[in-house]
């Protein structure tokens, strides 16, 4: 247990100095957790080009390039050469590539080989904070009162995962990133979305309607309760049109057997839509507000030096210098 805690202390993130580091940035020579890796490399396009790879499970100091399926660990080239000598050269190993940019949570899942770990299968799954007795006890058989405790379901396993010995920590940090990314939360949208140029008829104006060939037809029963056919005819026969109505904004409504007096016909019902001038005004208002926000930010902008790795600055200030340069450890 103490050895494992000491091993984790060697893998602390160089940016936050609190979380377990999982990736290694070669350009910065820094060990980073997933959250700090995204925070550091999302700053600008130059930082996003830095190549990163998973941190070696053996030395905790170098980027890994191989995955040993026998030991279930990721190794750098030197550690791979030391571990897989003649006695263990038969271990099944495969190379894997690192990544650049700022990948999203689904892209990181694909990189480390956890493609099947989706939102439904356990990425956002957590143990409930309060568990009732009914959730943990199930009946042992019908008619008896033998009960047995059930365990919390484990996380799904993936045999093709290449995240090494720190798979649980990888899943935990990915779960934290998924909460901050709105794209990971999948909300189901309704199948039929109302378009900006259409208005659907109120449902209380109809009786029980049957769906035939994608069109809604009036019911043949209780025709006296529905004077809607005459209303549609009056709208179609009248030459007057409401103001600010586009010519293309009309809906085809098939009418059948209404009051036994109207033959089957198609009536054009005008629908009021928003004009292009209103859209142009809204766009201009949004543009003006964005420009004003930019000017306010420009006034309060301060050009200060930002320290990316504070722990390195503290170590640099404590080291001895000779003529402005760092002295070697062997020098007096």
Swiss-Prot record:
Any one GO molecular function term: DNA binding
Keyword Magnesium: no
Keyword set includes Zinc: yes
Binding locations of Zn(2+) 1: 13, 16, 36, 41
SMART domains assigned: BBOX
Protein family (similarity comment): Belongs to the CONSTANS family.
Protein name: Zinc finger protein CONSTANS-LIKE 13
Origin organism lineage: Eukaryota, Viridiplantae, Streptophyta, Embryophyta, Tracheophyta
């Amino acid at each position: 247990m103490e050895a494992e805690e000491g091993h984790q202390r060697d893998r602390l993130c160089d940016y936050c100095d609190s979380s377990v580091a999982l990736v290694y940035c070669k350009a910065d020579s820094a060990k980073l957790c997933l959250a700090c890796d995204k925070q550091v490399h999302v700053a600008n396009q130059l930082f996003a080009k830095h190549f990163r790879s998973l941190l070696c499970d053996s030395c905790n100091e170098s980027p890994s390039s191989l995955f040993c399926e026998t030991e279930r660990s990721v190794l750098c080239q030197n550690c791979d050469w030391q571990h897989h000598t003649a006695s263990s050269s038969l271990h099944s190993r495969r190379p894997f590539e690192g990544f650049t940019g700022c990948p999203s949570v689904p892209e990181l899942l694909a990189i480390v080989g956890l493609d099947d770990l989706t939102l439904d299968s356990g990425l956002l799954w957590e143990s409930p904070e309060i568990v009732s007795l009914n959730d943990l006890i199930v009946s042992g058989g019908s008619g008896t009162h033998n009960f047995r405790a059930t365990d919390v379901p484990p996380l799904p396993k993936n045999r093709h995962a290449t995240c090494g010995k720190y798979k649980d920590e990888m899943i935990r940090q990915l779960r934290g990133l998924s909460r901050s990314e709105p794209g990971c939360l999948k909300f189901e949208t309704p199948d039929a979305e109302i378009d900006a140029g259409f208005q659907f008829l109120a449902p209380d104006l109809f009786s029980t309607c049957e769906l035939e060939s994608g069109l809604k037809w009036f019911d043949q029963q209780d025709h006296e309760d529905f004077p809607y056919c005459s209303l549609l005819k009056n709208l179609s026969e009248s030459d007057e049109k409401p103001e600010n109505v586009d010519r293309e904004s009309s809906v085809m409504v098939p009418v059948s057997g209404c009051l036994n007096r109207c033959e089957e016909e198609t009536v054009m019902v005008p629908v009021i839509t928003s004009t292009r001038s209103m859209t142009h005004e809204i766009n201009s208002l949004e543009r003006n507000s964005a420009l004003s926000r930019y000017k306010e930010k420009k006034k309060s902008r301060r050009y200060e030096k930002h320290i990316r790795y504070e722990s390195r600055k503290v170590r640099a200030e404590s080291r001895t210098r000779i003529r402005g340069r760092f002295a070697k450890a062997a020098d007096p």
